[in-house]
């Protein structure tokens, strides 16, 4: 397990009941350089006292692990498309959080589906210019994991990681340094951004798309975003179990319509009643999804 030292005391308590054999400890200043990193770590540990005492025998510091690995030789494992890639735990909206078993082919499929879906947008980026995507979402969330991180790798793009999107002034300061092309976010972040006085300190003229997920985007927020950037928020729908994107509004849409759009390529969706039968047009029902991005099942829950 790789863990921030701020939470190591919690890990220490539960470690004996797990099968974990290796612990890598990270500190907030590890990637900030020798002097700035040391200063940040001192403040976090001693001034703000954000690191409770702990004792984990055999734990290795992050920088030490990197140093050890720099001289090692990578032995690539034999990975097949049906091998498990991620146990993506759900938000627990229906009870206890469950581990969605996502295979390598599930994630690859969803990246390719999103690439095909967004081609009309990304194709408008000037030739030779690197696609720049903002990631103001936690990477442990499937939205950020696939749509931001994996999508940027597929595109050979630049991913701007925002550590704390609640700190809008700092986020705007960072975004103002870049030519932003794609802005994925949740409604609360879109709302906070467009209503903040520093929103226009960012040059949004290079924006080709804004995508909303995680929760419904409010119409008033979408309207204000369109007025200020000239680009609509394209809302989609997905969940941990579908890697995550299952549907979306067409990439060439010119306005927000309040819907979750239509299924992605090679994806089928139905609305079913309590008996598992399709509901009539216009009636509410449970969404059933079939496609290459759908999980293999729930971990240890046959």
Say what each PLM segment does.
Residues 85-112:
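Conserved AMP-binding A3 loop
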Residues 53-89, 96, 121-132:
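Conserved pre-ATP/AMP-binding loop-to-beta segment of ANL
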Residues 108-132, 140-182, 196:
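Conserved AMP-binding/adenylation subdomain of ANL enzymes
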Residues 262-266, 277-302:
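Conserved ATP/PPi-binding loop(s) of AMP-dependent carboxylate-activating enzymes
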Residues 1-6, 13, 98-101, 135, ...:
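Short beta-strand->loop structural element characteristic of the AMP-binding/adenylate-forming
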Residues 1-67:
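Structural core segment of the AMP-binding/adenylate-forming
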Residues 38-42, 157, 177-185, 194-255, ...:
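Gly/Ser/Thr-rich phosphate-binding loop
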């Amino acid at each position: 397990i790789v863990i921030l030292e701020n939470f190591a005391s919690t890990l220490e308590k539960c470690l004996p009941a797990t099968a974990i054999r290796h612990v890598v400890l990270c500190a907030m200043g590890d990637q900030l350089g020798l002097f700035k990193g040391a200063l940040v770590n001192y403040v976090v540990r001693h001034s703000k006292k954000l690191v409770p005492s702990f004792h984990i025998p055999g734990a290795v510091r992050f920088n030490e692990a990197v140093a050890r690995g720099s001289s090692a030789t990578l032995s690539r494992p034999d990975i097949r498309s049906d091998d498990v890639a991620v146990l993506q735990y759900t938000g627990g909206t229906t009870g206890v959080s469950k581990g969605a078993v996502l295979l390598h082919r599930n994630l690859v499929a969803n990246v390719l589906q999103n690439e095909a879906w967004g081609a009309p947008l990304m194709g408008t980026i000037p030739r030779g210019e690197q696609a720049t995507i903002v990631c103001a979402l936690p990477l442990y969330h499937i939205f950020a994991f696939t749509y931001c991180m994996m999508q940027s790798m597929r595109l050979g793009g630049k991913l701007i990681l925002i550590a704390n999107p609640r700190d809008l002034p700092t986020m705007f300061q960072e975004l103002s340094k870049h030519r932003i092309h794609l802005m994925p976010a949740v409604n609360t972040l879109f709302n906070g951004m467009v209503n903040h006085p520093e929103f226009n300190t960012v040059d949004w003229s290079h924006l080709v798309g804004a995508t909303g997920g995680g929760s419904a985007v409010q119409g008033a927020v979408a309207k204000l975003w369109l007025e200020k950037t000239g680009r609509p928020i394209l809302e989609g729908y997905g969940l941990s179990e579908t890697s995550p994107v299952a549907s979306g509004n067409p990439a060439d849409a010119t306005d927000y319509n309040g819907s979750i759009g239509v299924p992605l390529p090679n994806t089928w969706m139905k609305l079913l009643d309590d008996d598992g039968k399709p509901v009539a047009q216009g009636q509410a029902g449970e969404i059933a999804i079939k496609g290459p991005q759908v999980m293999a099942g729930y971990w240890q829950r046959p």
